A protein has these predicted regions:
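Acidic-basic catalytic patches of nuclease active cores, encompassing PD-(D/E)XK
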Residues: 1-43
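Non-catalytic C-terminal interaction segments of nucleic acid-processing enzymes
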Residues: 29, 33, 91, 98-117, ...
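Conserved catalytic cores of phosphodiester-cleaving nucleases, focusing on short active-site segments
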Residues: 31, 49-78
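Short, conserved, surface-exposed binding loops centered on an aromatic residue
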Residues: 40-41, 50, 54-55, 110-112
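Short His-Asn-centered micro-motif
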Residues: 41-43, 63-66, 123-124
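Short acidic/glycine-enriched loop/turn segments that link adjacent beta-strands
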Residues: 43-47, 127-128
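Short connector loops at helix/strand junctions that flank enzyme active sites
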Residues: 44-46, 58-62, 113-117
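Mg2+/Mn2+-dependent nuclease catalytic core
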Residues: 69-109
Length: 181
C-alpha cells in the first residue's frame, strides 16, 4: 500500500514563476471551452482572470498549483488549504462589486453584469485536475495554521490557511485538458 505524506514548504518565488503562467493558460483554455470570454488576464496582483460567460455572468478566477498533488488526490487529504492572505481578494471583490458602473469599467466589462462570482481554483502539478471553490465557501471555511509536529518552528507553519472540506457540496473537482503550449 502506497502511503503519501503531506509536505509543507515555504513560498518559493521560482516555483511561482514556473507554475503561474502555465496554470492561467490551462484555466483560460478550460473557461473558453465553457463559453467564457476572457476580459482581463493581466498580472495586477488581483485575481488572475476575469471572464463573462455567454449567459452574461461575470466571473473572477484565482488559480494556484498544489505541487504535492500528483495524478491522484490522496484520500487522506480531507481538505484543500488556501492561504488566508487570499482574503484580500474576497474583500476586493465585495468592495469593487458594490459600485457596479466603475467596477464594470475597471474590469473591461461592457456594462453592469450580475451575478458576479469569484472562484478559487487549485490545480494539481500536472495541471489536469482542479478543485473549484466559490468565494463564499472559502470565506466560511475554518482558518487555522498547519499542524506539523516535525517542524514546529518552521515559518510557513505560522501562516493561517482556510481549510476547505473536500466533501462540501458547493466545491467540485474536475479533470481538465492539459495545455502544453
Amino acid at each position: 500500500m502506497l502511503i503519501r505524506k503531506h509536505q509543507n514548504r515555504r513560498f518559493n518565488r521560482l516555483s511561482y514563476m514556473a507554475n503561474d503562467g502555465k496554470a492561467k493558460a490551462v484555466l483560460k483554455k478550460y473557461l473558453i471551452s465553457r463559453d467564457h470570454k476572457i476580459t482581463d488576464d493581466k498580472e495586477n496582483f488581483s485575481w488572475d482572470l476575469s471572464t463573462v460567460a455567454d449567459s452574461g455572468c461575470a466571473s473572477f478566477w484565482e488559480v494556484e498549483v498544489k505541487n504535492q498533488w500528483g495524478k491522484v488526490w490522496n484520500d487522506s487529504w480531507k481538505e484543500v488549504r488556501i492561504p488566508q492572505r487570499k482574503q484580500r481578494l474576497i474583500d476586493k471583490f465585495y468592495h469593487e462589486t458594490n459600485n457596479a458602473k466603475e467596477f464594470a469599467q475597471d474590469n473591461n466589462l461592457p456594462e453592469f453584469i450580475k451575478p458576479y462570482q469569484l472562484t478559487f481554483v487549485v490545480l494539481n502539478r500536472h495541471l489536469d485536475q482542479g478543485w473549484f471553490i466559490p468565494h463564499d465557501v472559502l470565506e466560511k471555511s475554518p482558518v487555522q495554521t498547519i499542524q506539523n509536529s516535525r517542524h514546529v518552528d518552521a515559518p510557513h507553519l505560522k501562516e493561517p490557511f482556510f481549510h476547505v472540506d473536500v466533501k462540501h457540496e458547493d466545491i467540485y473537482k474536475l479533470k481538465l485538458d492539459r495545455m502544453d503550449g
